[in-house]
């Protein structure tokens, strides 16, 4: 079972990835993890990627593609894998098709956890911090027990980090939506896309994903 897991920041992709690998015996291949592993193990592509990362530059597609290809060549992917964070654009999607075709494999499903942008802004911009002790809260998921009073130190002054402010979150989401939309269209045309409603509770989202994956087996 060869999968790609997609979803905008705040859609709950990390939580669902964890649930999938707990219940299906396939490796979770996150691009962040494989970059770190490739650099640590000094693979040819890891050495190449490190040059860009050390300079604070974006890693070119061909290097990212090479690192994914190295990882997909490992034995534990023989019976399937779940890619998370790749592909990020249409060039990478085409490269993935090519590398799978070379080893007589194909994608079985692309799971896209869909959450409306305004809900994502609310989820991602709800965090606030006690100015006195640094305790972190979220207005939806982890509000103080007494409104306006820190549970930890009893102070009443809170602030929000700049990157948690709604306008910053919205800008970050806009960038991701621009990358995501062509990929959703691409996989829809290929007939492998499964849209999952990510606005349900966590267990219900997983139930819907599980139904898709069970039908693939």
From Swiss-Prot:
The pathway entry for this protein reads as: Purine metabolism; AMP biosynthesis via salvage pathway; AMP from ADP: step 1/1
Q: Which GO terms describe its biological process?
A: AMP salvage
Q: Which residues bind AMP?
A: 31, 36, 57-59, 85-88, 92, 161, 172
Binding residue positions for ATP: 10-15, 127, 136-137, 200
Q: Does the keyword Acyltransferase apply?
A: no
**Domain of life, per lineage:** Bacteria
What EC number(s) does this enzyme carry?
2.7.4.3
Which PROSITE patterns would you find in this protein's record?
ADENYLATE_KINASE
Where do the record's region annotations for NMP lie? Answer: 30-59
Any one Gene Ontology molecular-function term assigned to this protein's record:
zinc ion binding
Q: Any idea what job this protein has?
A: Catalyzes the reversible transfer of the terminal phosphate group between ATP and AMP. Plays an important role in cellular energy homeostasis and in adenine nucleotide metabolism.
Q: What is known of its domains?
A: Consists of three domains, a large central CORE domain and two small peripheral domains, NMPbind and LID, which undergo movements during catalysis. The LID domain closes over the site of phosphoryl transfer upon ATP binding. Assembling and dissambling the active center during each catalytic cycle provides an effective means to prevent ATP hydrolysis. Some bacteria have evolved a zinc-coordinating structure that stabilizes the LID domain.
Q: What is this protein called?
A: Adenylate kinase
């Amino acid at each position: 079972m060869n999968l790609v897991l997609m979803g905008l920041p705040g859609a709950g992709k990390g939580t669902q990835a964890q649930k999938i690998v707990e219940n299906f015996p396939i490796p979770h291949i996150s691009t962040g993890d494989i970059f770190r592993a490739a650099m640590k193990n000094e693979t040819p592509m890891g050495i190449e990627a490190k040059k860009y990362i050390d300079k604070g530059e974006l890693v070119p597609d061909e290097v990212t593609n090479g690192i994914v290809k190295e990882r997909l060549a490992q034995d534990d992917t023989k019976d399937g894998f779940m890619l998370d964070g790749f592909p990020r654009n249409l060039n990478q999607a085409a490269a993935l098709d090519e590398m799978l075709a070379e080893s007589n494999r194909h994608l079985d499903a692309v799971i896209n956890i869909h959450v409306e942008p305004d809900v994502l802004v609310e989820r991602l911009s709800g965090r606030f911090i006690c100015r006195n002790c640094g305790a972190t809260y979220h207005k939806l998921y982890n509000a103080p027990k007494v409104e306006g009073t820190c549970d930890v130190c009893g102070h009443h002054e809170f602030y929000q980090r700049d990157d948690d402010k709604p306008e910053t979150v919205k800008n970050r989401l806009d960038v991701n939506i621009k990358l995501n939309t062509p990929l959703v269209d691409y996989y829809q045309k290929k007939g492998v896309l499964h849209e999952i409603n990510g606005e349900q509770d966590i267990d219900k989202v997983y139930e819907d994903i599980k139904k898709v994956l069970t039908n693939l087996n």
